[in-house]
Amino acid sequence: MNSFNIDVITLLPKAFELIKNLGVITRALDKNLINVNLHDLREYGEGSYRQVDDKPYGGGAGMVLKPGPIFKAHESINKFPKSKTLLMTPQGKVLKQKDFVRWSTLDQIIIICGQYEGFDERVRCLADEEISIGDYVLSGGEIPALSIINGLTRLLPGTLGDPDSLVNESHNSPLLEHPQYTRPQIFRDMKVPDVLINGNHKEIELWREERMLKRTIKRRKDLIKNEFCDLPIDEYDGDDWLWDL
């Protein structure tokens, strides 16, 4: 089995040292399931000072990443047949679980991390997709890139100790995951639901399916409006036609 290749263009390669101690990613690295290659943007900087940024045309606050160093870094990367370049930007489409599933069928992803006030607009032509992890702004693209590496790696065969743990996770379906409990059975007067300890697997499965639907409607109606358009989802307040969570 060939390794999945992840190339990251960044001004802060040290930010990715964390992956050496993240269980799932560390396991994948040890098994050669993934290769993570960091490309320090500073090494492709221009002039004796290896400049990577400059003032924006038209004025404005902050500095903008120059196109030259990013293009050089991207061109230096060996491209695999099935490869996509992802540009980390708060202007991109919001990352979804289905994106990880799509990318897991590739040979390679190349991630470009922004910094400062962003990057020269011409950098966008390098990207197959522009990705955001939410409607907020961070100081750089490194944290979003780490999120992508983590979410993608755990889908690769051989990474997780128990592959079945992926099946019922939140966002693998339109529904959020059901509540989970472990020992002790009673903790500070909070008791595990009886149905989970009665040994009736059909009742347990029904209970879980009901909780998945109810939890999703109560917390993330936006995930299921298209799936359950015949139900009065917008009218649900947690106390009427569905049980409380």
Swiss-Prot record:
It catalyses: guanosine(37) in tRNA + S-adenosyl-L-methionine = N(1)-methylguanosine(37) in tRNA + S-adenosyl-L-homocysteine + H(+). GO terms for cellular component: cytosol. One of its GO terms (molecular function) is tRNA (guanine(37)-N1)-methyltransferase activity. Its EC number is 2.1.1.228. GO terms for biological process: tRNA N1-guanine methylation. SUPFAM superfamilies: alpha/beta knot. S-adenosyl-L-methionine binds at G114, I133, G134, D135, Y136, V137, L138. The keyword Transferase applies. It is found in: Cytoplasm. Transmembrane segments: none annotated. Pfam families: tRNA_m1G_MT. It is an enzyme of class 2 (transferase). Keywords: Cytoplasm, Methyltransferase, S-adenosyl-L-methionine, Transferase, tRNA processing. Specifically methylates guanosine-37 in various tRNAs. PANTHER family: TRNA (GUANINE-N(1)-)-METHYLTRANSFERASE. Homodimer. NCBIfam families: PRK00026.1, trmD. Belongs to the RNA methyltransferase TrmD family. This is tRNA (guanine-N(1)-)-methyltransferase. It comes from Prochlorococcus marinus (strain MIT 9312). The gene is trmD.
